[in-house]
């Protein structure tokens, strides 16, 4: 979203139709992902950063796992410090336990990251091989999206010297 000559950034406020939307940059799914805090409703519009069902793909190479984890922590901070209770996702139903949802997402990412690290240690060296091993219980139709996230996880593990 562009207003005027510049894009939206942290701390910007958009007023539209009687609503006040605080801009919350949430890169990770993609580099330019944004969420919008609705303080009057104790809610946050999350777009693709947090979904109403399932979990979000980190769309490598544009999306980066480190950024995504930081964005989830930023959303957790909104639940703890600013009283956000409701997630209004871009896909799926409204979620009423914002803090619980964000904590689930953080735990899920930590679990998947550990699985990917173990898969590499066990000899699965390519993103495709890691997907086949780690996502064996997931519908094959979702594997292309899973591979994007695996590529982001492998990059993260390499950057942190873990593989």
Residue ranges and their predicted role:
Residues 1, 84, 162-163:
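Intrinsic structural disorder
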Residues 1-5, 136:
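Acidic/polar short surface loop at catalytic or gating sites that assists cofactor/ion binding
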Residues 6, 13, 20-113:
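Metallo-beta-lactamase
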Residues 4-5, 17, 58-59, 107, ...:
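Short N-terminal micro-motifs specific to bacterial/archaeal maturation
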Residues 7-8, 163:
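Generic low-polarity alpha-helical segments
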Residues 11, 41, 82, 123, ...:
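Secondary-structure boundary/capping positions in well-ordered alpha/beta enzyme cores
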Residues 118-163:
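C-terminal regulatory/interaction regions
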């Amino acid at each position: 979203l562009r207003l005027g000559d510049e894009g939206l950034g942290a701390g910007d406020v958009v007023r539209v139709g009687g609503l006040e939307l605080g801009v919350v940059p949430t890169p990770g799914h993609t580099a330019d992902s944004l969420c919008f805090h609705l303080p009057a409703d104790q809610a946050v519009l999350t777009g693709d950063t947090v979904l109403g069902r399932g979990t979000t793909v980190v769309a490598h190479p544009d999306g980066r796992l480190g950024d995504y984890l930081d964005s989830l922590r930023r959303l957790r901070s909104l639940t703890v410090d600013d009283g956000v209770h409701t997630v209004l996702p871009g896909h799926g139903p409204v979620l009423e336990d914002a803090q619980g949802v964000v904590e689930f997402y953080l735990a899920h990412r930590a679990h998947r990251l550990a699985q990917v690290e173990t898969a590499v240690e066990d000899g699965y060296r390519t993103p495709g091989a890691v997907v086949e091993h780690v996502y064996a219980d997931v519908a094959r139709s979702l594997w292309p999206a899973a591979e994007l996230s695996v590529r982001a996880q492998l990059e993260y593990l390499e950057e942190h010297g873990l593989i």
